[in-house]
């Protein structure tokens, strides 16, 4: 089949581009002709020009992500900047199926209806979601918008979501059945990333702690972790998450703020310990069998990581705060990855079955 993926491939965000890459590769393994639907936000060009003009750091980051996009997230459709353009031209692409997801593609109040595939004619193209997320734990009622989204979702052939709360929203708010699947990045094991994105990078055994902290807690946690690691003769690196983060944040010594997608992955692979409140950083800590702690992200989005940790029986790796007890646990209580891999294997097979039976 000719399949189009509708997601945040354009975002300067490691998780966004990696989940797109992972889903694309898995669908290609299953024998499909896979394209990225190049739907871009209208504001993208304006912001990009402004940041290029005033921020060298942004330019470096943009170049890194642009390289990944042009090298790995291909082929793409023509560029679409509006619903009007999609409605006028998308039918000419002649897709058999469009898959929306993964990531928080169903945050309707920010993104509108395109990610509910309002521009796709169901008579000619099947609509499916894979690991879509609403970006909220409960639906915020909005009258006519809720009705319109319900009508759009009823046109989907199959619906799958990433969080348990998403299953509930689909059932109780929109009256549709949704299946729970894993994030696309976990459809592959560590060896896949080592053979594709990390084949030119060295694997080391340095005693090192890596952290990736989102939001306003960043600076305090960074200093605390840096001091804690120094006292234990551990190297310490702080990874930023998106270009927006490094444009606004103050950095601790040793921060990496314009590394490539592969370099970001390699930092996690080469770490001994990982501390994060980022979902995808936690995902790769698990895939690379790292000792890790996930902190509560007070800006939201905790449902996705709690769903995953519960499924893998790793609830003890989640903490609402950062203190010495948590960090000592990180060092002294090895994660039983043999058992984790067995549970992950079951989840992976279930999610692959969803894709194989589309």
Kindly give the residue locations of the regions a language model identified:
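Active-site anion-handling motifs in enzyme catalytic cores
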Residues: 1-358
């Amino acid at each position: 089949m000719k399949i189009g993926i509708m997601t945040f491939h354009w975002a300067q965000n490691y998780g966004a581009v990696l989940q797109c890459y992972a889903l694309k590769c898995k669908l290609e393994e299953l024998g499909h002709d896979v394209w990225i639907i190049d739907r871009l936000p209208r504001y993208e060009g304006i912001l990009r020009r402004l940041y290029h003009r005033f921020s060298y750091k942004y330019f470096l980051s943009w170049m890194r992500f642009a390289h990944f996009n042009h090298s790995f997230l291909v082929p793409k459709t023509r560029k679409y900047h509006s619903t009007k353009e999609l409605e006028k031209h998308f039918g000419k692409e002649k897709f058999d199926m469009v898959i929306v997801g993964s990531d928080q593609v169903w945050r309707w109040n920010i993104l509108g209806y395109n990610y509910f595939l309002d521009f796709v004619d169901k008579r000619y193209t099947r609509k499916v979601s894979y690991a879509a997320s609403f970006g909220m734990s409960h639906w915020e009622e909005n009258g006519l918008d809720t009705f319109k989204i319900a009508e759009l979702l009823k046109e989907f052939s199959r619906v799958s979501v990433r969080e348990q709360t998403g299953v509930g929203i689909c059932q109780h708010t929109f009256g549709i059945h949704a299946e729970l699947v894993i994030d696309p990045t976990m459809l592959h094991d560590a060896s896949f990333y080592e053979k594709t994105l990390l084949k030119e990078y060295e694997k080391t055994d340095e005693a090192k702690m890596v952290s990736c902290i989102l939001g306003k807690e960043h600076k305090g946690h960074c200093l605390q972790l840096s001091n804690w690691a120094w006292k234990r003769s551990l190297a310490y690196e702080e990874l930023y998450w998106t270009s927006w983060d490094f444009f606004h944040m103050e950095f601790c010594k040793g921060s990496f703020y314009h590394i490539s997608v592969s370099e970001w992955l390699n930092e996690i692979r080469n770490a001994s310990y990982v501390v994060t409140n980022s979902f995808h950083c936690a995902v790769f800590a698990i895939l690379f069998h790292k000792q890790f702690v996930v902190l509560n992200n007070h800006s939201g989005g905790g449902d996705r990581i709690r769903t995953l940790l519960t499924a893998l029986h790793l609830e003890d790796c989640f903490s609402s705060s950062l203190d010495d007890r948590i960090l000592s646990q990180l060092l002294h209580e090895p994660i039983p990855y043999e058992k984790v891999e067995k549970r992950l294997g079951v989840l992976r097979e279930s999610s692959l079955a969803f894709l194989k039976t589309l």
